[in-house]
Amino acid sequence: QGFAQADMILERDYTTQLIEHAYIEPEAAAAVPGPGGGVTVYGSIQNPFSCRRAVAGVLGLPLARVRIVQSHMGGSFGGKDEVMSAMCARAALGAQLTGRPVKIVNTREESLVESYKRHPYKMHYKIGVRRDGRITAMEVRMLADAGGYASQSLFVTWRSTVQATGPYVVENVKTDVYAAFTNNTYTGAMRGFGSPQAIFANESLMDEVALELGMDPVQLRMVNGFEGGSVTATGHKLDEHTVSLKEVVRKATEAAGWEAKRARLPVENQGRAKKRGIGMACSFRGCALGAEGVDAAAAIVSVQTDGSVLVFSGLAENGQGLKTIFSQIAATELGVTLDRVVFMETDTSTVPDSGPTVASRSTIMGGSAVRIAAQK
């Protein structure tokens, strides 16, 4: 029906490549045997509690006998999740068998060989639009290369489904996303988690549609963009918060001098081997796990006898400023200066499991837990 209503139908294919995280610090872990057959593991670990479950499973120990302490990380970007669980389990097994501390540090070559990458995608888009730019229908097919193991492919492709048609109102949508096992390097979580591939394809398509219609790419996005009360392609009604897409696009393009540069640059580029241009793209993204499951986090705020404050959270600092944010929240709620607040290192023996540090969830979920704990 949607394609029947269209004045123009366009089909395009897009591909994205395998990408390495390239964090500055390679994977590293140290395991120390403890009393009663237990073990303590220190490492550059993105998700200490999932790591604890992996180590306990390999060693055949109860969770209470396994302590994971997160060290300061030299980058992660989603890449130090299950890879680090495997490394920590190997170090812990070595410590258990020898009764001595064991340390493992990957070389850069070992890191490149062993770690998972961003999923390469092949994508086919079909879009129907009216002459005024209004989208009437979209059909999307995506194929992700999972490599030899499933890893996070199920959830990465789920996220691609959500993002496939961008921040635009499209009433008639069909999206199919698949992940295929191959003999390539396996793929998993990387910053954006299935969104960058879809955003690249959809925003490239929007530019091509604008070109075919002889329409300004900004205007095409303004015609179709989300606003308050809009319904996404997956049925999510945007009615419980401010939807500022069009305002952001308007202000960004005004600040960039969009119209003036669009008029000037083609003239300036005449006869030049190297040409200059101006482009724009839109996206939308939620915080926390969303429809992937019920989300929760916990925190402990302990006020000492001298009025200083200790803050404990099960969410791990990955370089995003978590320690500062949580400390600021506690200081604000308790009415103390920031220098009176100390954020304690993530240690599975002293803090509650608050789920993984993924999906831009730490500030909104962990920060809310710190705020509530401080209030109480």
Regions found by a protein language model. Give the residues of each.
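Structural alpha/beta core scaffold segments of enzyme domains
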Residues: Q1-K376
